UniProtKB/Swiss-Prot annotation:
Region (Disordered): 1-66
Protein family: Belongs to the SMG9 family.
This protein's name: Nonsense-mediated mRNA decay factor SMG9
Gene Ontology biological process terms, A to Z: nuclear-transcribed mRNA catabolic process, nonsense-mediated decay
Cited function: Involved in nonsense-mediated decay (NMD) of mRNAs containing premature stop codons. Probable component of kinase complex containing smg-1 and recruited to stalled ribosomes.
Disulfides per UniProt: none
InterPro entries tied to this protein: P-loop_NTPase, SMG9
Origin: domain of life: Eukaryota
UniProt keyword annotations, A-Z: Nonsense-mediated mRNA decay
Keyword Chloroplast: no
Biological source species: Caenorhabditis briggsae
Length: 382
């Protein structure tokens, strides 16, 4: 019996063994130590899940949908991917932010930052994969049609580049047609008009302050609208889409306040008579100027390729301000406030794609554009 009691005593000593509970934390302790370590090292940015000073204190960029990267929203034939509905909820508190612009302007990078990435992460960690260095050198594009990334209350849409020769080369294979400028222009108008209708805010991202070709395309796309009079809840015909222009890869001259004010005034004049598009009249909210950051790649920072912490901190701060601004300025899609949720929004997108009026107006613009191209070609041959 005494031996049995003696055998029990070690067992009793093992029960309160606080060391055994404290001995398991050392296994997880390195993980806990690793997470807080990056924020001080990277200044104001932090790891993607800890947005710190870069994002508002709410969960506006929390990855509640479980998405690790963007997926295709529109497939090659221009229809919405079947699995998108699984990413959306019945919440009426959502914000749709799209990005359009020419090839290589940084659309995917800006959207990735708004979605929760930061300027110190590897490019392969971005939710919208930026164009690779090899593809950029060969003038190839990264995004085809439209990609989507969903976070808590935020829906980000990344559009293929506008007026891209790389896109135009692939159109005959997708559409079974021929390579011509009119077909490429029609494809650009279709996607731009679609995004202008279904988005709260459209970011126009370019390497120039005032890109007349892009602005003309937007003004034309504004007129290509669907007629969804039977859609419920009833849509507001007076709703205006918010436009924000972003100049990327800016030099020190581009960031001068006088230059920004002057170019912003030109943009306001270009859209002063717009019925469905609005531009902020507040200073420095119509046009945002961002300096170039180098996308971090493997084995990049060697020798002269040292990262500029000050530049990265300023870039992250601009993104933080933009993120807050995009939350405030949005009009309801419907006549009644908060009558549309995320899933209803997806139904509206599907109705736009199927709408006959939308495609009829698009065909008219396509026909007139092809006629103009034929006239120019004939005049050039003479």
């Amino acid at each position: 019996m005494k031996k049995v009691e003696i055998l029990k005593t070690p067992v009793i000593q093992q029960r309160p063994v606080a060391p055994s509970r404290t001995s398991s934390p050392p296994v997880t302790a390195p993980r806990i130590a690793i997470k807080p370590r990056p924020p001080p090292a990277s200044g104001n940015s932090g790891i993607p899940e800890n947005n710190g000073p870069i994002s508002p204190p709410d969960s506006s960029v929390s990855k509640s949908s479980g998405m690790k990267e963007s997926v295709r929203f529109l497939n090659d034939i221009g229809e919405i991917t079947d699995s998108i509905s699984d990413l959306l909820t019945n919440s009426p508190n959502f914000n749709v932010i799209s990005a359009i612009g020419p090839q290589g302007a940084g659309k995917s990078t800006i959207l990735s930052m708004l979605a929760g990435n930061n300027s110190r992460q590897m490019y392969r960690e971005y939710v919208f994969r930026p164009v690779s260095r090899e593809a950029n050198e060969q003038s190839r594009h990264q995004t085809t049609q439209i990609d989507i990334y969903v976070t808590n209350h935020q829906i980000f849409l990344d559009c293929q580049p506008m007026h891209s020769f790389s896109i135009m080369e692939g159109l005959p294979k997708l559409r079974g047609g021929r390579l011509d400028e009119a077909t490429a222009m029609s494809d650009t108008l279709r996607l731009t008009a679609f995004l202008l209708f279904i988005s709260h805010t459209v970011l126009v991202i370019s390497e120039t302050h005032f890109d007349k070709t892009i602005i003309d395309t937007i003004r034309t796309s504004e007129q290509i609208r669907p007629w969804l009079h039977q859609f419920r809840p009833k849509l507001s015909i007076e709703r205006m889409t918010n436009l924000v222009f972003i100049k990327t890869k800016a030099s020190s001259i581009d960031t001068a306040p006088s230059v920004i004010r002057e170019r912003a005034q030109l943009l306001r004049l270009a859209f002063r008579d717009s019925k469905w598009l609005k531009i902020s009249k507040e200073p420095f909210k119509c046009l945002l100027v961002l300096e170039e950051i180098r996308v971090k790649r493997e084995h990049l920072y060697e020798g002269e390729d040292e990262i500029d912490e000050t530049m990265l901190n300023e870039f992250d701060e601009h993104i933080a301000q933009l993120r807050v601004m995009l939350q405030r300025n949005r009009d309801d899609f419907t006549v009644e406030t908060a009558a549309m949720d995320e899933k209803k929004w997806l139904e509206m997108c599907q109705e736009v794609i199927r709408d006959k009026t939308f495609h009829r107006i698009l065909k008219e613009f396509h026909r007139s554009d092809r006629d103009r191209s034929s006239i120019y070609a004939e005049n050039g041959d003479r």
